UniProtKB/Swiss-Prot annotation:
Similarity comment text for this entry: Belongs to the flavokinase family.
Name by which UniProt lists this protein: Riboflavin kinase
Gene: FMN1
Cofactors required: Zn(2+); Mg(2+)
Note accompanying the cofactor annotation: Zinc or magnesium.
Residues at the catalytic site: 116
Binding-site residues for Mg(2+), renumbered to this chain: 39, 41
Entry keyword annotation includes Kinase: yes
Length: 178
């Protein structure tokens, strides 16, 4: 399936905005290591599960927790430290733009539906276990299968560009207050 044209409305339209609170969990680690596009994975709840698979955009904000560090094992056997966001800096705690993929990631042949938030910001540390509040303001495109990793990366970068252009509009800026 070819990438469809994306038409972003002048302002969010029903059913948006969708506002969610969640916690960042570890995924497979491929967003950072393989694609150079890190993601904050979040559990799929009933509200997210009802959305069409595909790419969405909106705003998000991280909040650290005061829980102690803990070591958890990913499904691939690698251990990760849940620091609950305690190393986040002030700049990391601002409301930031995001794109979110909801779906099966056909390129990676996932067996479970995943929700992956790419926060458009450079972080110095991981923040597994941190709280994340976000709003979904619109839909960019359906989930697609790719024949190459390069094509996937190119499309993700286009999604990011589209999201940033949409979120720069005054009507979308008003939703920055999470």
């Amino acid at each position: 399936m070819a990438r469809p044209d994306t038409v972003i409305p002048d302002k969010p339209e029903s059913p948006y905005p969708i506002v969610q609170d969640s916690v960042v969990v570890s995924g497979f680690g491929r967003g950072s290591s393989e694609l150079g596009i890190p993601t904050a994975n979040i559990p799929i709840n009933d509200d997210l599960n009802q959305l069409e698979t595909g790419i969405y955009y909106g705003w998000c904000q991280l909040k650290p927790c005061t829980l102690p560090d803990e070591c958890k094992t990913r499904t691939n056997g690698r251990e990760v430290i849940y620091n609950h966001g305690k190393n986040l800096r002030n700049d990391d705690l601002k409301v930031l733009p995001m794109v979110m993929s909801i779906g099966w990631n056909p390129f990676y042949h996932l067996k479970e539906k995943a929700a992956e938030v790419h926060i458009m910001h450079k972080f110095d540390d991981f923040f597994y276990g941190a709280q994340i509040k976000f709003n979904v303001l619109g839909y960019i495109r359906p989930e697609l299968d790719y024949t190459t990793k390069e094509a996937l990366i190119e499309d993700i970068n286009l999604d990011i560009k589209i999201a940033l252009e949409a979120l720069d509009r005054d009507a979308y800026q008003t939703y920055k207050d999470l």
